[in-house]
Amino acid sequence: MYKVIIIDDEKAAIETLRRDLEVQADLEIKGTAGNGAKGKKLIMDIHPDLLFLDIELPDIQGIRLLSEIREQVLWDMKVVFYTAYDKYLLQALRESA
């Protein structure tokens, strides 16, 4: 079973993604957060296998959050960035998302 965390400030986006992911038998949503500070704590507490991360959060950009925790994440965590803004694509790719 893969542990999943969703970090997004839009509750509707979290619920849509949760609904889509819950039909996958090998994925378990372990937590959600609406900002980077709560998301960072969830990541460090839960050690997810898969992180869905919105690029635009109220307190920090998702790319910046990933950059800040990179040294602390010592497990294999896959990151899926998503956003409505294509201007962040290259920066996200540079962060290995």
Predicted segment positions?
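Two-component/phosphorelay signaling modules centered on CheY-like receiver
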Residues: 2, 11-31
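Short hydrophobic beta-strand elements that form part
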Residues: 5-6, 81
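Extended hydrophobic secondary-structure segments
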Residues: 7, 13-14, 58
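Conserved sequence signature across two-component system core domains
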Residues: 7-8, 33, 51
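CheY-like receiver
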Residues: 40-97
